[in-house]
Curated annotation (Swiss-Prot):
It is found in: Cytoplasm. It comes from Methylobacterium sp. (strain 4-46). Residues 125-311 form the Tyr recombinase domain. The active site is at residues 170, 195, 263, 266, 289, 298. This is Tyrosine recombinase XerC. GO terms for cellular component: cytoplasm. Belongs to the 'phage' integrase family. XerC subfamily.
Length: 320
């Protein structure tokens, strides 16, 4: 059970709390969902149980199995009234369906109401990649010269962002690397364990290796082989929030829009490769997407604009 959602704090009867605990354990250990995904699923179910309790129904397993479509629609309407968007509602339904399947597997019966409720339609947002020059600038240690922070911290931030743009990593994947994983000293690949514990091999180009080597040379801490590769100013694991704040500061200095985030560098990696006639399935493998359809959304980005940008700066060239 997640530490943030102890069983005794969940709304509902004891049988529901026990079922939720076993369900979340299944998601984490057998389905190998990431901690963030398990947390989101737990939160969705907790909100639904709280909604049922506010409506005057003490949630227990028999009452959940006997749910009517109108009960689910009432929950969705209440969440919409609270300002929750379509994507979050779609995930909430996915969470409820996952829990319902768990109840069915455990022999409690079928929650047939869920099959009668459609997921909200959500228009898929296009990725918002950065122009090549902006992505190169964000991932460049030179752009940080003069900042009022220790040189090793500037080198660290540059190395993290170089991994996002130069290798297409998610920020959680980059910050989850151990010291012994660092692709330096002749190593030019990374083994990444991504969403759903899916493993992929990622090539690491020379500018990224150089950024990592510069950080390691400057870092004042003795990094244990099995410890985090990236550390904060006190030597503990680096928080994603620190990287986000660093990018926000650079955004202002470079005059970039609010869409210039750490994750935008991963979008830029994929879109810029595709614009250079990169193979879609190869890009899918590099990004760690389970479905090709997820990668195909990058084909809708204006490739003509990107090709023009590539004439000014090529991301696979010697610059980062």
């Amino acid at each position: 059970m997640l530490q943030t959602t102890p069983p005794d704090l969940l709304p509902g009867a004891a049988d529901v709390r026990e079922a939720v605990a076993s369900w979340l354990t299944l998601l984490a250990r057998e389905r190998r969902f990431s901690p963030n995904t398990v947390e989101a699923y737990a939160r969705d179910l907790r909100q639904f149980l709280a909604h049922r309790a506010r409506a005057g129904t003490q949630p227990d397993i028999p009452s959940l199995v006997a749910l009517k479509p109108r009960d689910l629609r009432a929950f969705m309407a209440a969440r919409r009234a609270e300002g929750i968007g379509g994507r979050s509602l779609m995930r909430a339904l996915a969470s409820l369906r996952s829990f319902a399947r768990h109840l069915e597997r455990e022999g409690h019966g079928t929650v047939s109401a869920l099959s009668a409720v459609r997921s909200p339609k959500v228009e898929r947002r296009l990725p918002r990649p950065l122009p090549v020059a902006a992505a190169v600038a964000l991932a460049s240690p030179d752009i940080r010269a003069g900042e009022d922070r220790p040189d090793w911290v500037l080198a660290r931030d540059a190395a993290v962002l170089a991994l996002l743009y130069g290798a297409g990593l998610r920020i959680g994947e980059a910050l989850g690397l151990r010291r012994k994983d660092a692709p330096v000293g002749g190593l030019d690949t990374l083994t990444i364990v991504g969403k759903g514990q899916k493993t992929r091999m990622v090539p690491v180009i020379a500018p990224v290796q150089a950024a990592l080597a510069e950080y390691l040379a400057a870092c004042p801490y003795a990094l244990a082989p099995d410890g985090p590769l990236f550390v904060g100013q006190k030597g503990g694991p680096l928080s994603p929030r620190v990287v986000q704040l660093a990018v926000a500061s650079l955004r202002g200095a470079l005059g970039l829009p609010d869409s210039a985030t750490p994750h935008a560098l991963r979008h830029s990696f994929a879109t810029h490769l595709l614009a250079r006639q990169g193979d879609l399935r190869a890009i899918q493998d590099l990004l760690g997407h389970a479905s090709l359809a997820t990668t195909q959304i990058y084909t809708k980005v204006d490739s003509a604009r990107l090709m023009s940008a590539f004439e000014a700066a090529h991301p696979r060239a010697g610059r980062m």
